[in-house]
Structures are given as structure tokens and as C-alpha cells.
Amino acid sequence: GEDVEQHLRVRLGIDVAAVGLEHLLAQRLGLVLGGDGSVLRAADFVRGHNVPLLAVNLGHVGFLAESERTDLHRTVQAIASESYVVIERMALDVVVLVEGREVARTWALNEASVEKSHRERMLEVVVSVDNSPLTAFGCDGVVLATPTGSTAYAFSGGGPVVWPSVEALLCVPISAHALFTRPLVVGPRSTIGVDVLTRTRETGVLWCDGRRTVELPPQARIEVSRSAEPVRLARLNPTPFAERLVRKFRLPTDGWRGPVTAQERAGVLHAVETVEPRHAGPRPD
């Protein structure tokens, strides 16, 4: 916005100018001003070009952002002095096949979601892992996510929060019409498949990061696997992921009885450290 541009020009003495994509891809770092949606859009441009992204949150939660708008001065100084570290976040390769023929190929940083395109009917799907059918059910959709995406759409659908250091793929059914359908976490070398059955009658739609769409006719198959091209993010002050969760989601760390005192917390830690490990001995007959 104009206020950010003015801040860069007047207070920091940085000239702002529109440049082409070729110029952006030649830089050592890309600064993103916005929320998580802006990060996902920027990742479209820089993925595969080794350009890390550093985001300043101008939105709401800004889970992928590294700093807030009030820290813009400090952020620019850190960039100028290259006082940051670069981490890699796993991405997904997404392939759509119809009758065995590839009709679309795309990718996702957060998630690929298979959804119904009409509210009147459910999707009928079969979920498979490494070409082995696992379960079939009717649903509003299926979210296939990365650990990065575990705090986004998959989280809203009841999926687990997965630490970014864990390499895994998530499968989270949305409003499944089944008794025992639960979210799945599979290994990073696996391929998750979702087949849209002909009994669905209506088309579905594939959404990747809420941005890229592909229409899914009955008999379409979606295959998701780990991508060889991660997305690189810059971090100014790497903090434990648990702290980021608490700060971004404003999680309550106090029980209903009130704040936990430092003395109580120290007592719990001391008790954990002094517990002797139990060794399994022979079982009695």
C-alpha cells in the first residue's frame, strides 16, 4: 500500500519501483507484504528459482509471515545485513488423470483439496495409498496437505497439527458420511490417490492452495506426492514451532484454574527429570 511505500522511501531511504519477473528471480530474497495468501501467490513465482521469501504480515493471522507491520524498519535492516536463515518447506506435486490419461499437473504448498462443485450432492470417492485402496466414502471433500498446510484448511477439517520438521502427507476427509473415517498421516515417499466414482454423477473441483482449480469429472483420479521442489522461506529469529502456534493462534496456556506460576512449572519439569525409566523385565507365568 501507499503507507508501506512511503515508509520505505522516507524513513528508510529505499527507492520503490515496479520491476519485471526476470528481475525478481535474479534477487537473493523476495519481501512479501501481506498475509498468507500473498505468500502463496509469491511462491508461484519463485518456486524452483532458489529465491527465499520473507513475509511481513499485513493481514490477519499471517501464519507464514515472519514479522508484523510494526517491525518493518527492523525487518528491512535485517534483510540489508543478511541477518536471516533460510528454511525449506515441503510442497506437493498434484496430477489429475481421467481414464488413465494425464489432463492436468500442478502443485501446492499448503494443500490440494478435492471438493464437490454442487452443494446438493456428495462426492463419492475412494482413497488409496501407494495404489492400494484404503477406504471409500461419500463426503463434501478431501484435503491432501503438507505439514505447512496442517494449520490451514486441514486444521479446520479436524486434521492434526504436524510440525514442519516432520516429513509427511496428510489426508483429511471433509464432512465424510461414514462412521470410521479419520484423518491419515502417511510417509513422505507415499502417493495418496483420490478416485471420484461414477456414482457421484456431478463434477468435482480440485483446488490447490485456494488458487489454482481443475474440474474433476466422474472417473477422475487425483494423485498427490512430495515435490522435489520445496518452497524456501527466510526466518529472522527462528523460534520453536510451539511458540509460533501459541502466538499466531493466541492459544490459552493457562488452565481454567488460572495462570500456571513459574514455581509450579519448575516443579513439573523437576518431576519429569527425576522419574527413573522403567525397564521391562520377564513377565510372570
Which residues does each predicted region cover?
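Catalytic core of DAGKc-family lipid kinases
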Residues: V61-G141
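Short Gly/Thr/Asp-enriched flexible loops that form oxyanion-binding sites at enzyme active sites
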Residues: R41-R47, A154-G158
